[in-house]
A protein has these predicted regions:
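A short, flexible beta-alpha/helix-coil linker loop
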Residues: 10-14, 127-136, 172-175
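N-terminal beta1-alpha1 ligand-phosphate binding loop
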Residues: 2-35, 188
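Glycine-rich phosphate/pyrophosphate-binding loop and the adjoining helix
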Residues: 21, 139-206
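A short beta-strand-loop structural module common to alpha/beta enzyme folds
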Residues: 35-48, 168-171
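A short, charged/proline- and glycine-enriched loop
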Residues: 1-2, 117
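A structural motif corresponding to the C-terminal end of an alpha-helix
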Residues: 31-37, 112, 118, 156-165
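Helix-loop-strand module that forms the ligand-binding subsite of alpha/beta enzymes
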Residues: 51-153
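Acidic-and-aromatic substrate-binding clefts and catalytic sites of carbohydrate-active enzymes
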Residues: 46-52, 72, 174-177
Length: 206
């Protein structure tokens, strides 16, 4: 495993400048360069060729997504990017079909992906504090990010055949974005990413 494709979904929109996700992208790049991975990076704010982006998915051993959560969904530019690129990847390395046959269409939905053997990793950034997910009576009713807001996102990647390499979530990045917290997050995130990459390398070697 050596090829890593990073997608910076930190869209510039309204009061959001995408600055923090650019920072996370640079942290990821630092880790990958120190481990001698081959890297490609796309930014959803840039114009793109959907066919070339589909080639990036096909080239990658691991796809890394970085994005803020807006209104409990991915930013609109990232959704547009995924729609365009995954359509370009139909019968072209990303997915073939929904996996079902007309003989028994009740079963095997979601098994038509073409990216088996590949992994993905995701980070999200939030205004919401972590306690909004963990404390009884708080907004997300004790549903985690991955089991709640990102459930569909994870299923999307599973549809292509990719396996999750893990996720890391940055909370309270509006009201509590102190330099100390950001510095601590950098250390924690880089260690988490290094361990995740070691785990997938061990899986590949086995």
């Amino acid at each position: 495993m050596k090829n890593i494709f990073i997608i910076n979904g930190g869209q510039t929109f309204a009061h959001s400048g995408g600055t923090f996700n650019k920072t996370i992208t640079n942290w990821t790049k630092d880790v990958l360069e120190s481990e001698n991975f081959e890297i490609r990076i796309s930014n959803v704010n840039d114009d793109f060729d959907a066919n070339q982006e589909a080639e990036n998915f096909k080239w990658a051993d691991v796809v890394v997504y970085h994005f803020p959560v807006w209104w409990f969904q991915v930013p609109n530019r990232l959704k547009f990017y995924i729609d365009e690129v995954f359509t370009a990847g139909h019968n072209n390395g990303i997915y073939k079909s929904d996996g079902r046959s007309r003989v028994n269409p009740a079963i095997n939905y979601g098994t038509g992906g073409l990216m088996h053997g590949k992994h993905y990793f995701v980070t999200t950034s939030w205004n919401a504090p972590e306690t909004a997910f963990t404390l009884e009576g708080e907004f997300f009713n004790q549903h985690s990010v991955d089991e709640g807001v990102l459930f569909g996102f994870h299923r999307m990647n599973a549809f292509t055949g990719m396996k999750s390499l893990g996720s890391f979530h940055f909370h309270d990045m509006e009201k509590q974005a102190t330099q100390e917290r950001i510095d601590n997050y950098e250390i924690e995130y880089k260690n988490y990413l290094k361990n995740a990459l070691r785990n997938v390398n061990a899986e590949v070697l086995n």
